């Protein structure tokens, strides 16, 4: 679940900023 949460958070940031966060 921790990994899923991290991915979801990163995906949200990427969508919000409109840039790839990696």
Curated annotation (Swiss-Prot):
Enzyme type, top EC level: hydrolase
Reaction(s) catalysed (UniProt annotation): [(1->4)-alpha-D-galacturonosyl methyl ester](n) + n H2O = [(1->4)-alpha-D-galacturonosyl](n) + n methanol + n H(+)
EC number: 3.1.1.11
Biological or metabolic pathway of the protein: Glycan metabolism; pectin degradation; 2-dehydro-3-deoxy-D-gluconate from pectin: step 1/5
Location within or outside the cell: Secreted, Cell wall
Active-site residue numbers: 6
GO CC annotation terms, alphabetical: extracellular region
Source taxon at top rank: Eukaryota
Residue(s) at site: Transition state stabilizer: 5
Keywords: Aspartyl esterase, Cell wall, Cell wall biogenesis/degradation, Hydrolase, Secreted
Positions bound to substrate: 19, 21
GO molecular function, one term: pectinesterase activity
GO BP terms, alphabetized: cell wall organization; pectin catabolic process
Similarity remark: Belongs to the pectinesterase family.
Name listed for the protein in its UniProt record: Pectinesterase
Organism: Capsicum chinense (Scotch bonnet)
């Amino acid at each position: 679940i921790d990994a899923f949460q991290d991915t979801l958070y990163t995906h949200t940031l990427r969508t919000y900023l409109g840039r790839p966060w990696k």
